[in-house]
Structure formats: structure tokens, C-alpha cells
Amino acid sequence: LHPGTGAYYEMRDYYNRLTEEEIRGNPDMICAMSMLRSMTFEPEESEKWYEILKEYIRHMDRGDSDYRRVCGLQSYLEIGLPHRGTEGLAKKLPAVAKLLTSKTVALPEMSVTSNLPSLLRGGKDFSEWVPKDKGLYNTIRIPVEMVLGRYGVGLGDIALTESLLEKGEDVSGRFLSLTALQEELRARGTPEMEFVLAALLVRTLLTAGNTGKARDLLLQFRAEAVERGATRLLPNIDAMRCRLSLLDGGTFASVWFSELAPNEAVFYGMERYRYLTKVRCCIKHRQYHAALLLLGRMLDYTRRYARPLDMLETLILISICRYRMESDDWREHFASALELGWKYGYVAVFTREGAALLPLLERFDHRAVKPDYWEKILSGTVVQAGYYGQYLRPPDIPLTRLTQMETLILRLISQDKSNEEICALLDIKMPTAKTHVRNLFKKLKVSSRAEAQKAARRLGLV
């Protein structure tokens, strides 16, 4: 079992029914509890069980036939616990590789993707490695792939390409080598890594405005995942389909939002990709408070679990949400996003928001931002807005924003108030009321009060 398949979380009810005494007597259960508590947002409990495992090992006979395997469980937790981030990992992985080579430990199989379409922010967020990605590729690629076994096949090349893509660099020249990796992954790798590779190709195609090819590739991979029984990948594959649908105005996004979106009543970190997809749907449908509630939980999670790239995406979506709510604090959140993005050199996480982000860029005072960094973000966002002009645009949004008075009058019309009643309630004269109603009808593209009421409900204006 490993967190990549979600098995620990799926079996949480079983583990929670066990007594502490029962768990303490089994090193596999101790390891499972440490990982489970980390995954369920209880890092202190996770560390408690990690220490219990260390104590268990100290009391073992080194000649015990199970000693190597149990030591491997400790190494597994040291590498894989989600809440520990990546600090020291670049040194730890080669050290574990040496232990494997000398047969000092035996590691359980582990996934680095958590079923997500990313290596940079799979089981851990590797943002700290991004500024020095090429150097790390040359120094630790081989030991990392050794430690991860099947899950390490192609990892170095995929991770480097994703890092370059996130920094806004052109990765089309790496397509040939990545395509060749597909066959190697099918032969020696895992469906999880194949998903990351497919997602990387999809994102590259979308960056170039090629939605048709991107959709075909994603649907082809989905069909293969179903055929091979890799159904654990489907929730995140469908979340990616939803994001693609949001870009090109397809119908799948509405289906996903109403039928497949996750329920965050119990917050589960491994659902983060789907949570941020749901947030985009909420923003599109003007459900801003629902979006902010979920974004607030994501912000807390990303801070506590050292996930800079997920935090950056969260801050950008908060900025868009607050901007659409006409709150001035969007600038504060966006400034934080720019500061964090510049630290790691991230560009694509901004530019992918295209038409949804462009109005913010046009109104933000960017004098404190490095000019070359700002130019990369602005130019890339303009290109994406050109490809996907309808992205996150509310359904049938009026071309001109309603004034505060027009919004008040629309609400009163929705309550079946007459012009006379509107004049009395708002203390305005009849000609003024008629002018506002006429302008309101023009903006809503309607010709009667009944049509105005329907438009108000459809647009979420009342």
C-alpha cells in the first residue's frame, strides 16, 4: 500500500477501529498510521507514530529476517510523509539508494504522484528544486529512479520538462524524447507516471491553443486507463477534462460540476487538484463565497504542508475571486502571488488563467515587480486570453456591468414591484426610474420585466 493509490485513506475506518495496543505490535500498521495521519491533516499524530516505529526498530534483533524490511518502512516515511515537505530530500534520496544497493534496507513500493497529473506537486511539492532543476537532474536522477523502482521510470525527464514548462519555457523540442518514453512506461513503468506524461503533453498542446488534439490525447488515455483497470486515476483525469472544457466552453464542465465535483465536508489533501478545479467552476458560476470557503482551506493546507506551487495557484484564484466581488483586497493577494511566483520563477501558473486574469494585470500597479518577470506573465496571459476568450466567463454575462442602482432596481423587479413602488422605495422620481429600467433592459438584452426576472436568476444577479 502507498498513498499514491489512496489505499491508506480508503482503509481509514479499519485503522481507526484498531486499538493503539494492536497497532503498536505490527510495524506495517504503525507505518500505515503515520502515513494516514499525515494525509488526514494530523501531522503531530503522524510524527508520534513515526517515533513509535523508530522505537520498534530499536528493539528488533538485527539478525531478524524482517529487520531490513522494517527499516525500509522508516526510510519510506522519511521520504514520503506529505507534511514534511522536501527539505533535505535531495541528500536523503541518494543515501537511501546506497542502502538499497548494499541491501541494508528493503523499501516498499511508493508513488510520487498521488494519482495527480503532476510530478512537481504530486505526493510532495518540489518547488524548492525548480530553480536548480537542471543541476539536480544531472546529480540525483539515477538514485531517485533507483529508489522508486517502477515509479521512477522516466521520472527525471518528465520532471525536468514539467519544471521548464512551469517556468514558461518552450518545451516543444522535448516532445520526441517524451513520446518515446510512452512505450518505455507501458513496458516497465506505471499508469500513474503515464498519466503525468499524458497530462504534460496535454498542457503543452493547450499552451499552443490546440484544444482538439489535447482533448483527443486525454480521452485516449482515459480509455486506456479504464481498459487496464487503472480506475483510481479517473477522478483526476475527469477533473482535467473539466479544466479543458472550461477553456473552450464545452459542456463537460457543467456535468462535472453538478455530478462529479468532490465534497470537501471532510478536507482531504489528495483531492487538491479536484478542489481547485471545483473552485474554477464556482467562480464561473458566480458562487464566490463557496469558492472562497474552499480556497481558505486550501491556503491553510498549502502553508502547513510546504506546497508553494499549490499555494501560488490558490492565491491567484483568490485574487480573481475577490476582483470579481469588487473588493480592493484582490491586489494584496495578487501581490503575494507575484512575490511567491518570482521566488521560484513560475510563469505558467499565471498565464494559464488567461482571460480570467487579464483584467487584473491591466489594473495592477506592477512597478515593484521585476520588469522581465512581469513581461513574461503579461505576454503569456495575453496569448492564452486570445486562445480562450470565454474562459471562466459567467454564462451570458452582460457586456456592461450593472450600476449599483440598476442592481437594486433589478432586485425589486424580481420581487414584482411596479415602477411606482420602486420610486417610493428608492426615493426617486418616475422619469429617473424609467431611465434606469430602460438601461437595465438594454444591458440584459431583454424587452420585458418577465424576461428581466429570468435573466436575473440565470445570471445569479439576485
Task: Set out the residue ranges of the language-model regions.
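Structural motif corresponding to the intra-repeat A-B loop/turn of tetratricopeptide repeats
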Residues: 5, 40, 81-85, 167-168, ...
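Alpha-helical repeat scaffolds
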Residues: 10-17, 44-55, 86-101, 130-144, ...
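Residue at a conserved register position within TPR or TPR-like alpha-solenoid repeats
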Residues: 2, 37, 82, 124-127, ...
